[in-house]
Amino acid sequence: MTNTKGKRRGTRYMFSRPFRKHGVVPLATYMRIYKKGDIVDIKGMGTVQKGMPHKCYHGKTGRVYNVTQHAVGIVVNKQVKGKILAKRINVRIEHIKHSKSRDSFLKRVKENDQKKKEAKEKGTWVQLKRQPAPPREAHFVRTNGKEPELLEPIPYEFMA
């Protein structure tokens, strides 16, 4: 067979619904509120063919720049050969969901504000930057009366 050039070529598993999730789309999908500036994940839903994003945007994260009755406009970065372009696409809300990529950052901002407030009241300095995990503390290894065994590599022998 020849290599077809259809819009949905190679999407047999990409746009298929998960096991036991076929049929009517849950109403919660339509009840979600999207505002300008929201960060959303694009994931095509095969149940709804209208307003489906192209397969190249599947799994990408973008920012909402426009909201209409049934769809939203999203700015997504797309790599075209050597350059990254900011593409503006219109996608129906069935094919997007709020991204969790910013949740950890926003949680950290709240915690840092709380730490700053407490430190200001006490008049102390507080470390706000995340620190890498330090090396483990020194400790003794129990051998249970057994002598440690010395391991060394076998010397190389050339066999002709």
UniProtKB/Swiss-Prot annotation:
One of its GO terms (biological process) is translation. Its main location: cytoplasm. One of its GO terms (molecular function) is RNA binding. GO terms for cellular component: cytoplasm; cytosol; cytosolic large ribosomal subunit; cytosolic ribosome; endoplasmic reticulum; membrane; synapse. Keywords: Cytoplasm, Disease variant, Endoplasmic reticulum, Hypotrichosis, Ribonucleoprotein, Ribosomal protein. The keyword Secreted does not apply. Residues 112-145 are annotated as: Disordered. Gene3D superfamilies: 6.10.250.3260, Ribosomal protein L21. InterPro entries: Ribosomal_eL21, Ribosomal_eL21_CS, Ribosomal_eL21_sf, Translation_prot_SH3-like_sf. Component of the large ribosomal subunit. The ribosome is a large ribonucleoprotein complex responsible for the synthesis of proteins in the cell. Belongs to the eukaryotic ribosomal protein eL21 family. Component of the large ribosomal subunit. This is Large ribosomal subunit protein eL21. It comes from Homo sapiens. The lineage of its organism: Eukaryota, Metazoa, Chordata, Craniata, Vertebrata. The gene is RPL21.
